[in-house]
Amino acid sequence: SIVPIRCRSNRDCRRFCGFRGGRCTYARQCLCGY
């Protein structure tokens, strides 16, 4: 799921998404549980 936060790196998303992890998209949004 998309999380509307401004990420700078995948690490930001992993912290925000929790154990399932996530990645930072080109639009600087986190995509969790991909």
UniProtKB/Swiss-Prot annotation:
Processing after translation: Contains three disulfide bonds.
Keyword Secreted among UniProt keywords: yes
GO cellular component terms, semicolon-separated: extracellular region
Subcellular location: Secreted
GO biological process: defense response to bacterium
Key words of the record: Antibiotic, Antimicrobial, Disulfide bond, Secreted
Principal subcellular localization: secreted
Domain of life: Eukaryota
Function field: Active against both Gram-positive and Gram-negative bacteria.
Name the record gives this protein: Buthinin
Native organism: Androctonus australis (Sahara scorpion)
